[in-house]
Regions:
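Generic enzyme active-site microenvironment
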Residues: 12, 40, 162-164, 193, ...
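Active-site acidic/histidine proton-transfer and metal-coordination neighborhood
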Residues: 61-191
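Short, basic/glycine-rich phosphate-binding loops at helix/coil junctions
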Residues: 55-56, 121-127, 225-230
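Short, flexible active-site-adjacent loop segments at beta-strand->alpha-helix junctions, enriched
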Residues: 42-47, 94-99, 167, 230, ...
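Histidine-acidic metal/acid-base catalytic patches
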Residues: 1-6, 21, 32-34, 78-92, ...
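Conserved short-loop catalytic and cofactor-binding motifs
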Residues: 15, 60, 165-169, 201, ...
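N-terminal pre-domain/capping segments
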Residues: 1-79, 84-88, 107-120, 277-280, ...
Length: 284
């Protein structure tokens, strides 16, 4: 996989979840051979040995099980250590979700049925907001209780944690909560990681305004995952093949923001090369 990515002309790449411990030695050898840089590490790296398939949310800081929250912490500390070893400045982190609520799936179904402007949809969305607001702080407190140790460890290793926005409304923090959430973490070692596809999905659900959210988060933005979304919810598509308004959004990024192309494994190499070429023409 590394060889294939480099063959497309990339000189830097993100090492993501799904890489096993047994594969990391090969990655290190390829890095020594090709001298590529690692832009970021995505939690959890390496993949937990007890997990059989790629699952970045297999352990969450929001879990009601203390042992799962502790496991999430240990795995995050390991990811930070690997980031330092690989010279990666960032670790992208999922902070968890409210598993007891089922909010996003019903809203998605109604959008797919063309009901986004119906009274029924508005009623369901308001109910989702109210249900989430009742319990959100409980889960936020769980995250912060454990995340503080990871932030301190990242500081010692010279690494920043990028807290990523997610595509479902059960995620913690929500877009509304993000500014306050980050204020409760050390700004020297944490920041916001913007996923364009996830934000566009939330936009298509009527939960956020993509541009307004990105503009609001710009002061804490340290990196982003770039991919497009085809209506209404198919993300990880090459840029400029969906409906994400990159021409409007990219100028909102701070100058020193890390940018990582995050494609579906099914994406054809030629489509990636075409998207990168167009991106450079527009934004470089």
């Amino acid at each position: 996989m590394v060889e294939e990515i480099l063959s497309l002309g990339f000189e830097s790449l993100e090492l993501s979840h799904g890489i096993r411990s047994s594969q990391l030695e090969g990655v290190l050898q390829a890095r020594e051979r090709h001298k590529f840089s690692v832009s970021s590490v995505h939690n959890f790296l390496p993949m937990p040995v007890e997990v059989l398939t790629d699952s970045p949310d297999c352990y969450e800081f929001t879990s009601h099980r203390a042992k799962d929250r502790d496991r999430a912490m240990r795995l995050t500390l390991s990811s930070i250590d690997w980031a330092e070893k690989l010279g990666a400045p960032f670790v992208v982190v999922h902070t968890g979700r409210i598993r007891s609520l089922n909010l996003t799936a019903p809203l998605r179904k109604m959008v797919e049925q063309g009901k986004i402007y119906s009274r029924e949809f508005i009623k369901r969305k308001l109910e989702a907001v109210q249900a989430r607001e009742k319990v959100a702080e409980i889960y936020t407190a769980r995250i912060l209780e454990f995340l503080g140790e990871a932030v301190a460890h990242a500081g010692k290793r010279g690494v920043k944690l990028g807290i990523e926005n997610r595509e479902y409304y059960e995620a913690v923090p929500s877009e509304r909560e993000f500014p306050d959430f980050l204020q409760r973490l050390d700004a020297a070692h944490t920041g916001y990681w913007h996923d364009f596809g996830h934000a566009q999905i939330k936009h298509n659900l009527g939960l956020i305004d993509h541009a307004q959210h990105l503009e609001k988060m710009a002061p804490r933005l340290i990196g982003c995952h770039i991919h497009d979304t085809r209506p209404p919810f198919r993300d990880h598509c090459p840029p400029f093949t969906g409906e994400t308004p990159f021409d409007q959004l990219v100028p909102l990024l701070p100058q020193k923001c890390a940018t990582v192309l995050e494609m579906s494994p099914r994406t054809e190499a030629a489509d990636i090369v075409k998207a990168v070429s167009e991106w450079h023409q527009k934004f470089k």
